[in-house]
Amino acid sequence: MNTRKIIGIVIMVLLLLLCAVLAVLRFDAAKASDAAALRESLATPAPTAAPDVTPEPSPTPEPTATPEPTATPEPTPDPDSPAGRAAALGLPEPPDIDINSWEFILANGDNSIAEYAPPELVTLEGQLVDSRIADALAAMAADTRAQGLSVYLSSGYRSYAEQEANFLRVCRNNGVSDGKDSNGFYITMPAGHSEHQTGLCCDITDIYYPTKNRSLENTAMFQYMSAHCQEFGFILRFPDGMEPITGVMYEPFHFRYVGVEAAEYITANNICFETFVSLYRDIGTAENPQES
C-alpha cells in the first residue's frame, strides 16, 4: 500500500473519530441542559393554590313593616246632642226620634200634665187606653196568653178627677198625705202628674189584686211580659233600683208604651224613661211633648 493511501485512511479515521467525539459532546451538552432545567424546575416551588374563599353570605334584609292604616278618628259629638249626652253616661248613641212626639210625653213628680187629654180613647178588655196603643197592647197580652199565662188589665186611663180621688184614697189607706213612702218615693201620684192620665200605660197582672205591690214580680206572667214587652213597644215604667231617678216606688205591673225603637234601647241599656228623655231634652220643668 502506498503511503498516500495510508495517509488518506488515517485522515478518514481521524475524521470519523472527530465526528464521534462531537456527537458525544453534543449529547452530553443536551443531557446537561436537560438536567439543569430539571434542577431548576425542582428548585422552584410550585405555586401555592389560592385557598377557596367561602364568600360571606349577604345579610338578608329585614322586611319593611307595612304601617298600619291610621284610623280616622270618630268625630266628637256635640255634648248637648243626644249622642253627646249618651256618651257622657257611657251609653251608645240613642235612636233618631222626635222626642216631642206623643208617645214620649213625660208625667212624673216634676212634670205636670194637668191639662192633657188623649185625643181618642178606646176600651180594651174593660180598660180605657189611648187608641194609638190599643193594637200593641192587645198583641202583647195575646203573646203572653199564648205561653199559657193569665193576663188581667187592671187599670188604664184615669182622668184628672179620677186620679185625684185615687190619690186621696191611697194616702188615707197608707196613713200619708203626700203620696210618698218612708223613703220619699211616690206610692201614688198627685192628680196631674200620673201617667194614667196619658192613656199610654196600663197596670197588668195575672189576676185581680185589691192591692198591687212588689210581690207581683214573682208571677210567671210578669216575668215573661217584662222580658218581652219591648218587642211590642212597652217598657216597665218604674223599675227596681231606679226609684231615685223616677221618684216612684218599684211597680212590677205598670207598663208604658213608648214605641218599639225606644223600648228596645231603654231595655237593652237598663235605663228608665226619665234617663231616656233626658238624652234629648232637659227634663224637670221642661215642657212636655205635643198632646197629639
In which residue ranges do the predicted regions lie?
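Extracytoplasmic cell-surface/polysaccharide-interacting catalytic and binding patches
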Residues: 2-292
